[in-house]
Each structure stands twice: as C-alpha cells, then as structure tokens.
A protein has these predicted regions:
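N-terminal Sec-pathway targeting helices
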Residues: 1-12
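A broad structural signal for short, well-ordered beta-strand segments within beta-sheet-rich domains
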Residues: 138-142
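Low-complexity, Gly/Ser/Thr/Pro-rich intrinsically disordered linker/tail segments
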Residues: 143-156
C-alpha cells in the first residue's frame, strides 16, 4: 500500500511539473475569488477540488484536477507558500487543504479525498459557501497557502 501511495505522489509531481515548468503567470486574486463566489453553491456537491481548481484557473494559475488532499503537494509548485496557522488572519485568495479525516470510509464520498477551499475576502468557499473554515465536525489537520509574488512569476 505504501508503494502505491509513493508512486501516486511521484506521478502527481511529474504531471504537475510537466504542466507548470517554465510557466510564468500572475495570479489575479480578484478574478479567482469572483469566479468562486459566483459558482459556489449553498450545499456541497462533493466536488470541492473541481470548483477550487476552476477558480485557480480563472485567476491565471495553471492548476490541474487532483484529489483535494493532494493539493498540499501541488500548491508549492505553483508559487503558493505555506502560511503558519498560528495567529493566522485570512486574506482573499488564501487556500486551505484538509487531510482526509481518520476513520473515514471510502464508501462515503464526503471527505474521503480531504477538502480544499479558498477564502474570497468574506468567507471560505469550495463547491459550497462554508459557514467556517473547516467543513468537518471533528478536528482535522490542514495546511494554509498564500500566493507569493516574486520576480519569477511576473510576465515580461
């Protein structure tokens, strides 16, 4: 089982690297959050990764579809840096990636692949408009990411 997980991680990096190598892009937070706000629903459709990926793409990020919890490997590849959760103050465009909750059965589609969402400046949105950052009742490990502007990702 470990070897399958390891191979999956390698495949993610190779595919993500293929699509993002030498990609110079600027991420437009306003376009991404507007897209997500307009398309976010009132109830979950269990497609958080799809909706968040489409918002990232609307903002100019060369995002690909992945299971939600695997975005923790992808976000650093596309110029998003991890932000410490201690003393965290959300900013528009921030992305949160939740691990799969322990004990979650593969038979339940909800949460099996983790969860990913973006902050639009007012609330967290994935495939639905969330009441708080975490969609889970129990405490689940998560990572926060913020787009970093650098000379490398500015188009000339």
């Amino acid at each position: 089982m470990r070897s399958i997980k390891r191979l999956a991680k390698i495949a993610i990096f190779l595919v993500a690297g293929f699509f993002t190598w030498s990609q110079c892009y600027t991420f437009d937070v306003k376009k991404a959050t507007t897209h997500l706000t307009e398309h976010g629903r009132n109830k979950s459709t269990h497609c958080c990764a799809w909706y968040t990926m489409r918002a990232l793409q609307a903002g100019g990020c060369p995002a690909i579809i992945l299971p939600a919890q695997w975005y923790k490997y992808f976000m650093p590849l596309v110029q998003f840096e991890e932000v410490a959760s201690e003393g965290y103050s959300p900013q528009a465009g921030d992305v949160v990636v939740f691990e799969r909750p322990k004990g979650r059965s593969w038979k339940k589609i909800s949460g099996w692949w983790g969860h990913v969402a973006m902050y639009n400046g007012e609330q967290w949105i994935s495939d639905f408009k969330q009441k708080r950052m975490s969609p889970y009742r129990q405490k689940v490990p998560y990572r926060l990411y913020r787009y970093r502007v650098s000379a490398k990702n500015i188009k000339t």
